[in-house]
Curated annotation (Swiss-Prot):
One of its GO terms (molecular function) is endonuclease activity. Belongs to the phage terminase family. It comes from the Bacteria. This is Protein YmfN. It comes from Escherichia coli (strain K12). Transmembrane segments: none annotated. InterPro entries: TerL_ATPase, TerL_nuclease, Terminase_largesu-like, WH-like_DNA-bd_sf, WH_DNA-bd_sf. Encoded by the e14 prophage. Could be missing about 80 N-terminal residues compared to orthologs. PANTHER family: PROTEIN YMFN (PTHR41287:SF1), PTHR41287.
Amino acid sequence: MSTKLTGYVWDGCAASGMKLSSVAIMARLADFSNDEGVCWPSIETIARQIGAGMSTVRTAIARLEAEGWLTRKARRQGDGSSPHCAVVDEYHEHATDALYTTMLTGMGARRQPLMWAITTAGYNIEGPCYDKRREVIEMLNGSVPNDELFGIIYTVDEGDDWTDPQVLEKANPNIGVSVYREFLLSQQQRAKNNARLANVFKTKHLNIWASARSAYFNLVSWQSCEDKSLTLEQFEGQPCILAFDLARKLDMNSMARLYTREIDGKTHYYSVAPRFWVPYDTVYSVEKNEDRRTAERFQKWVEMGVLTVTDGAEVDYRYILEEAKAANKISPVSESPIDPFGATGLSHDLADEDLNPVTIIQNYTNMSDPMKELEAAIESGRFHHDGNPIMTWCIGNVVGKTIPGNDDVVKPVKEQAENKIDGAVALIMAVGRAMLYEKEDTLSDHIESYGIRSL
């Protein structure tokens, strides 16, 4: 491979006073330059054309640059490439996805191109690598299917003790081969002895992203609650709760549909056929510098038929109202908890249809108990859902924010703006209202439990 001259601009210098080799080099550079005077020839090419050695050409170019005849111009990395295979190493170091995208778009002329990214964890959760990690997780858990993506993440599990030597093998599958166990053990011990080194060890040797906040709900447990056989027909005529999180008109809006049943004295929850809406422009008119990744998710879900696109730049709430009315025909709606943000008009419309809207402010008071109840129901197997991929994505994006000094009071937040939690928030509100309707003691229940007493 020839050594690249990384870019020089010929300033139209005069040849007077230069050595013959320098004049010849300038002439060759001029031949290679474009209209702006920019050229990208290899040193090997210049040397061959003027009949000089490569070391002579390098020395002459360095002298011409030092004397001001040439100025260095940065070249955009990867431009002009058409690779069969591109390998991006330590992707977490990339501030943007510019190089990755350049390589990917250059593969259009290849029949079986391969884009391969290799990396440890890093510190920039706003960067392209962390976003790619989320994309891989979404593919693996099935919320955003992608047959063109293969990904594998070696890291420790939630709740693992990072100081335990046993966890090293989880994050280092080649332990004892390309990295020695003794080395990892020594680094682990150093991190245990020096708090300043702990984050470095976790990031580089356990693939734990620094600054990344843990998801509140366990997605493995959530997926074990999945029951794709659940249909609305199974709950026809049974009261349900419709909960709405409307977000912004430019963003995704959601409706959760929740049923409850008493089984062996315990409340079981059923999330069936949730609905999601997003405006057309948010899905298909995203500029290159905007949130392309979210738009790609939305497009995939539209193709799957689980996301409804409304015309224009804003969600038309009339679509949502019609869906709520249709839901009421299948199952009588007992209540419609709704986020008050921007929802005044829809709330009035729901009231006109006797769908009993209840305004729920998303604060610690209203969200903590139902959020913890939903977690408990998921872990105990009392929660059942139909596997809607958008709801799964939203659940996986929920991070628990607690009151300082009190980890027992919590509310749902998202780690980043693109990590939508609308469906999860609607579901939590529905669980909160269902908790108020849990079976109460009637006179018959009391007599059955305690018998008749004489006063």
